[in-house]
A protein has these predicted regions:
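Acidic, polar ligand-binding/catalytic clefts
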Residues: 1-58, 135
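Ligand-binding cleft/hinge of the Venus flytrap
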Residues: 72-93, 122-126
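Short helix-initiation/N-cap motifs at beta->coil->alpha
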Residues: 1-9, 51, 90-101, 105
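A ligand-binding cleft/hinge motif common to bilobed small-molecule-binding domains
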Residues: 6, 22-31, 75-78, 104, ...
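Short loop->beta-strand "edge-of-pocket" segments that line small-molecule binding or catalytic clefts
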Residues: 57-73, 88
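Periplasmic-binding protein-like
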Residues: 40-47, 72-76, 119, 123-177, 180-191
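Hydrophobic residues within well-ordered alpha-helices
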Residues: 11-12, 59, 103-104, 143, ...
């Protein structure tokens, strides 16, 4: 596990070879050498089960937890154009564990992140959390290598990932984690 805010430095100095963890390709197409996309993911919001927050518009004036340097952080800080209401406070955490602990303890009213990561945690305790039906953003996920490196490996990996999409492997894995296989593999429009 790496410190997510340090990911670019770790990649550029060779400490890590690639970034492969719910990493959005959207808006970063020219910043990295990409393999994929291997799946689609939505940015979603989770709240405590008893919360009065039912929709994105209910986030107005609320405290939001996000992981630092993520798409969710950019959305709530207004760095990416969105129709989100103005929130009271955006709290950025180094890890998803810290972000979800803040929700559990009531330090934030809601948390936002990639559907796969949020589902991983909320599915462990479905009686305590729920995910809003509306999504913040949809994106393609890929494997990022430092720009100008590993072009052959990225091409081979892209082909392998495409084969895994076609033969149903990625869909089966998605279902094991409580995700909609069709949307995860083929996006909102489906196959």
């Amino acid at each position: 596990m790496i410190s997510w805010p340090d990911k670019n430095n770790l990649l550029s100095d060779g400490t890590i070879d690639c970034i492969w963890s719910c990493f959005s390709m959207n808006g970063r197409e020219t910043k990295y050498q990409w393999a994929g996309p291997y799946m689609y993911s939505r940015q979603v919001v989770a709240v405590r089960a008893g919360s009065d927050i039912q929709s994105l518009s209910d986030l107005a004036g609320k405290r939001i937890g996000v992981q630092a340097t993520t798409k969710a952080e950019s959305l709530f800080l207004g760095e990416i154009s969105s129709l989100l209401p103005e929130v009271k406070q955006v709290n950025s955490f180094e890890t998803t564990e810290d972000m979800l602990a803040a929700l559990r303890k009531g330090y934030v009213d809601a948390v936002a992140g990639h559907e796969a990561l949020v589902a991983k945690w909320t599915n462990l305790d479905e009686s305590s959390y729920r995910v809003l039906d509306e999504s913040l953003y949809s994106s393609e996920l890929g494997v990022a290598f430092a720009k100008g490196t590993h072009a052959d490996l990225a091409a081979q990996l892209t082909q392998t990932l495409e084969d895994m999409k076609q033969d149903g492997t990625i869909g089966r894995v998605a279902e094991k984690f409580g995700l909609d296989a069709e949307k995860t593999v083929w996006g909102e429009q489906g196959k």
